[in-house]
Every structure is written in structure tokens, then in C-alpha cells.
Amino acid sequence: IPSIDQEHLSLVLGKHYVISFQDRIEGDVFDNLRKRVNNPKSRLRKFRSDYLFYALIDSVVDGYFVIMEFLKIRIDDLENYVLENPDQQVINQIIAIRKQLTMIRKVVMPLREAVDRLFSDESDFITEETYLFFRDVQDHISHLMGSFDGFRDSVGSLTDLYMSNLSNSLNVIMKTLTIFSLFFVPLTFIAGVYGMNFQHMPELGWKYGYPMVW
């Protein structure tokens, strides 16, 4: 399962500016946004700084939707693998996805709190029109949280299904071993009887005794 890269991001909104602080500036969720900024006809060049501030946060949220779609596909694939071939590799992937979901939730929660705080504090730098855009971002984050929680439940169900299939496989093996052991019970009994050191065993003098045992 591919790893999910993390990066620290800070945004500062002023009346006529937005300042961003991040670890790297290439290959991130803002690549498409940079192209829009460089386009003279782009809405980002015509609107105020608060709209750019919104666009940056919206790009981050959209990036999580890409991750969500990827994880959905992986969970669906793992469900088929668990049913067909519940081996150790499958449970390792289930554990890896569960860790990723936990990590993502820890990252999305502060973002949700930050967006909620924009509404409770009502910044003078954000217009009423831009607040409507932020309302959509708020809804998208809530949808993300619900989806990731649902995925976490699905991963828990996959773990239970894996353990159930593994238990069934062990039961089949035990039944097979039991059948083989029942087959050897008479042989073990005969070997035990004739392995005893009794002084008088009449059948030992029978000429067909040895062939009958074999």
C-alpha cells in the first residue's frame, strides 16, 4: 500500500495578502492552483485575498477526497482478498490501512476546527460572499469525517471476517487430521497389544498371525 505524505502548512490572511508557509512547493495539492494564479483571466486574479485564502483551504480538502477514493478502492479489493485468500499479507494491508485512517483523521480534525473557528470569530478580512464558499468547505470536511469513520468500521469488519475465515480454515485442517488419526487408531491398538511382553500369547504361534496384522 503506497504511503501518504504529510506536510505542515500554515496560512496567514491579511486585508490584501495571503502568506503560506510549507515544507515544499512542488508536487503538492497546490500545483493546479498555481497554474490558475498565473492565468491573467483567472478568478483568483480578480477577487480579493480572502477568496485566495478559501481556494488554498479548498485545495487541501480536495486532496483528502483523492485519498478517500483511493482508500475506498483498496478496502473493496481487500474484501475480495479476505474471502478468497485470507493470508498474512492481507491482514498486514488491513493493519496498514487502519493506521492511515487514524493518521488522516488526526490531521483533518484540526482543519475542521480551524474552519469552524472562521465562522465563530467572523474575520473582518472575509466577505459574506466568501463565507458562502467556506460553508461548502465546512460541509465537505464533515463529509470527509463521516466517510473516514465509515471506512474505519469497514476495516474493523474486514478484520473480523479475516479471523472468521482463518478459524474456518483451521477447522478444516483439524477435521482432516482427525480423519487420519482415526485411520491409525486400529493400527496403534494392534501395535500396542503385540508390543506387550506377555509370556503366553497363543496367536503368536498361528502361521497366519503376521500376515493378518499387516
Feature map (PLM): residue ranges:
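Hydrophobic alpha-helical transmembrane segments and their immediately adjacent juxtamembrane loops
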Residues: 139-214
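Peripheral, non-transmembrane regulatory/ligand-interaction domains of membrane transport proteins
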Residues: 1-128, 133-136, 140-145, 150, ...
